[in-house]
């Protein structure tokens, strides 16, 4: 699963920009371990997005522009698309689909 590329593709789709998986893979070629956060950021910049890489916890979720890509446990990428009162987090996970997490 190319979770990082798929997440970037979801962000593009949200903003009305449709790109094939092949195009995304050319912009951000995966290695055996997948794509890096830096690689995703560079590809997003090429696609016209402004990116910021930062560490945040759930208390800062109201300050984040949504949707955004999260680097989950340093080994997986997901898209956070909704936060409800800082207690429920709605995530699009390329491997699991739409998932809701609560505190």
Report each predicted region and the residues it spans.
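Conserved active-site-adjacent core of cysteine acyl-enzyme catalytic domains
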Residues: 1-103
